[in-house]
Amino acid sequence: MSDFLGQTFEGLVVGAIYALVALGYTLVYGVLRLINFAHSEIFMIGTFACLGVTMILGYSTDMNPLGFGLFIVIFTVIVVIAGAISGASAMLLERVAYRRLRRKNASRLSSLISAIGASLFLIEVFRLMTESTDWAFPRLLESKVLFQISTAYIDQTKLFILISAIIMMVVLDQLIQKTRLGRGIRAVSQDERTAVLMGVNVDKVIAMTFLIGGSLAGAASAFYLLAYESTKFNVGFLLGVAAFTSAVLGGIGNIRGALAGAFALGLIQQYASSVLGYNWRDVVSFVILVLVLLIKPTGIFGESLQRARV
């Protein structure tokens, strides 16, 4: 029972990171009907932005963890800067790789090829810049056990990640449901032509959608480094597959579906790896993705929720 509780907690933490990245996939698909395969590289850019901030602030891997109060201040700075850089990168990606194709009414295949090309370009650029090496991230917060249930341990670092990520999800949900920008995103998602007739600036809405999705990926990159403490040029690939699987599992194009899919995948991965071994965790993502696409491509929530989109 204690092992089950421990695996559940770990699965929820992993799922929270997946969820923040999956939101970028589902938001873009909602407004453009485009699978932005370069989104995983926006996450990767975020990890290196986090590293850059810690280097500028003078933190290194041989330093002791920070006190919780100072950690909150420093980590907030890291998240804000990483989110800004990732968000700006996502907006630039939309401007360079997708906007001209959209204005020319190019086929979805053209946009898909552009997305794959952008992804490969970013991977190769960072491979050359970082010399294909792993980059360590300093331990900013001590992994102190807050409480224990039998042999299951709940440490403050992962609990902080889970709570912070959930807060971001709630804020995003409220932004989409209750703000003018959110109404614009939902309008474009449901019917772009009608949205134009109603006075919605579609280009601005799409750009802001990429900004939001990219910023969430940047925040996710900070949480990822807090948990795993290293990155490299291709760090976004497997995590991107898991996040995309989460979006498909819940019903791509639907925010709450993506969140549910992410937590479900995190739990499934954790339970499966406890039985099969950790190395099988990513295999589980591929298997689930294939099964969902074959059996229920609209996601586990079905057509009714899928029509709701964002």
Residue spans of the language-model regions?
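Membrane-interfacial amphipathic/re-entrant helices at transmembrane-helix boundaries
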Residues: 1-21, 49, 60-77, 104-109, ...
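Pore- or pathway-lining transmembrane helices of multi-pass membrane proteins that form conduits
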Residues: 41-45, 99-126, 235-248, 264, ...
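Alpha-helical transmembrane segments within multi-pass membrane transporters and channels
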Residues: 62-114, 118, 260-265, 296
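Inter-helical junctions in multi-pass inner-membrane proteins, predominant
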Residues: 2-10, 14-17, 175-177, 206-246, ...
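Helix-loop-helix "hairpin" substructures at the membrane interface of multi-pass membrane proteins
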Residues: 152-231, 255-260
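Extracellular/periplasmic helix-loop junction at the C-terminal end of a transmembrane helix
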Residues: 120-149, 274-282, 301-307
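Cytosolic-side transmembrane-helix boundaries in multi-pass membrane proteins
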Residues: 193-197, 201-204, 276-310
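Single transmembrane alpha-helix segments in multi-pass membrane proteins
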Residues: 4-55, 92, 96-106, 110, ...
